[in-house]
Regions:
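Charged, solvent-exposed interaction patches on well-folded alpha/beta domains
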Residues: 2-34, 40, 57, 61, ...
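N-terminal functional module detector in eukaryotic proteins
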Residues: 42-44
Length: 253
């Protein structure tokens, strides 16, 4: 009997000890969370990488205010706010370190191309996002994409062509990506999708380049560059990259 009472007392002491440890951990965790919530605040916001926008415009687009809590800051919400307000920005990195400035690194898209439609010039980034709406006469030096119809164009949304242009849309996006990756986009003066059998690109002020839809565009662009490298600087004409066997034909003007 005495042994049983002793065992019960020891069991109660063990239970209280465990409870004490749990409560202590909860108190410590609560204190840490309270400290993070109360003391780690947004002081300075530093923005890098912007060209078209000012630092103040990027900061305003974040929706973050001075003295906002860093610990509770949702980086994904901040990034989405910036993308929604400033469409030329395509990549964002947010470095949130406690007791340091909030660092925001942005990357803007390359020079856009224009689709002229219904009296407007819709500027499209190389990544396929509509980044700006202008009057048709204000397209400036933007290369023009012709022979297609935008479907419900809205700034900040991905380029979408009408259903009958599905093949052209996919090929256009793949070509733009290949041009940007190859560093050749600045030589493009226009892309024409009117012909359903061949895509035509005005290039370098000297060439009309014909390519099939659905092609391996990185490979086609390497072939194009090889042709150009073997021509005289005053030669102009049509470069045909439409052959399945990889042949390249140059028809001089």
């Amino acid at each position: 009997m005495a042994r049983r009472r002793h065992s019960n007392r020891r069991h109660r002491r063990g239970s209280f000890g465990f409870l004490y440890k749990v409560l202590s951990m909860l108190v410590i965790c609560g204190a840490i969370i309270a400290a993070l919530t109360l003391f780690f605040r947004v002081g300075t916001i530093v923005v890098t990488g912007q060209e078209r926008y000012t630092e103040a415009e990027v900061v305003a687009a974040t929706g973050v205010e001075q003295d906002d809590n860093l610990f509770l800051l949702n980086k994904y919400t901040v990034a989405n706010n910036i993308l929604a307000e400033l469409p030329y920005i395509e990549e964002i990195r947010i470095n949130r370190k406690l007791q340091d400035p909030l660092l925001i690194e942005v990357k803007e898209c390359g020079d856009p191309l224009a689709v002229i439609q219904d009296g407007f010039a819709w500027l499209v980034s190389p990544g396929g996002k509509i980044v700006e709406q202008r009057g048709a006469s204000e397209a400036g030096d933007c290369p023009v994409i012709s022979g297609c119809q935008l479907l419900a164009p809205t700034v900040g949304t991905p380029l979408a062509l009408a259903t009958e242009y599905a093949t052209q849309q996919q090929s256009l996006l793949e070509l733009l990506n290949a041009l940007e990756s190859a560093g050749m986009l600045d030589q493009v003066e226009g892309i024409h999708l009117e012909d359903l059998s061949v895509l035509v690109m005005d290039y370098g002020g000297r060439f009309s380049v014909e390519m099939p839809y659905g092609a391996d565009y990185p490979r086609k662009l390497r072939a194009l560059q090889a042709v150009i490298d073997n021509l005289e600087t005053n030669q102009t004409g049509t470069v045909q990259l439409t052959w399945d066997n990889g042949e390249v034909h140059f028809i001089e003007d």
